[in-house]
Amino acid sequence: MDWGNVTVDDLFDALREVDWSSPPRPPSEFFSRFTVPKSVPKWDSRLKCNLYYYRTNYFIMIVVILGLGVLTRPLAIFAALLTALSLAFLNDSFAGSFSEKATRTVRRFSPQLAAKMRPPLTPVTRGRPSSKRAIHVCGQPRWVFVLTCSLVSFALWYISSGLLRVSVALLIAHLATILHASLRTPNLKARFNTFREEFRAVWRNYSEI
């Protein structure tokens, strides 16, 4: 895959749709080899490749840095967790998995309520979905959960007076992510993994037809 031809929008769409349940790469691979890119196009391609391949590692690193920044403020810790949850809901795989597990848990106690938590059916025309299926969480549009978690987390940030700390922590976390993604040399395993996930995505789209 030529990452130089991948736009920022394509990268965000891929990160939104890809499965994030895969475990992070081992530290021996994550901190293996670093080199300075020889040109701006090579840097651009390397940055996108590493952001996609090491996405779970970067997410954990950002959460850890945020946690260290608000360690002495309990309310800020809850705010950080809600912020991470609101961002996680933007991923299709996480939102669907969370909704399925929550519905399955509620079904044990109240089957009627669990039935209301199911996503609405997508209209079908000539055997195919008439439109792209919208993501629902517990029967509600995804944006409801994203907006709720974001508003509550912002209120907790404000109450705990941790906005300055979290801003500095976020800045450090993002700089560390960009620095690592810029200097980490992509290996053959990363390229092979990209091709494999591309094949899975194509096969999944083909099976839905």
Swiss-Prot record:
InterPro entries: Prenylated_rab_accept_PRA1 (IPR004895). It is a multi-pass membrane protein. It is found in: Endoplasmic reticulum membrane. GO terms for biological process: vesicle-mediated transport. The chain crosses the membrane at residues 51-73, 77-99, 144-164, 166-186. Keywords: Endoplasmic reticulum, Membrane, Transmembrane, Transmembrane helix, Transport. One of its GO terms (cellular component) is endoplasmic reticulum membrane. May be involved in both secretory and endocytic intracellular trafficking in the endosomal/prevacuolar compartments. PANTHER family: PRA1 FAMILY PROTEIN, PRA1 PROTEIN. Belongs to the PRA1 family. This is PRA1 family protein A1. The lineage of its organism: Eukaryota, Viridiplantae, Streptophyta, Embryophyta, Tracheophyta.
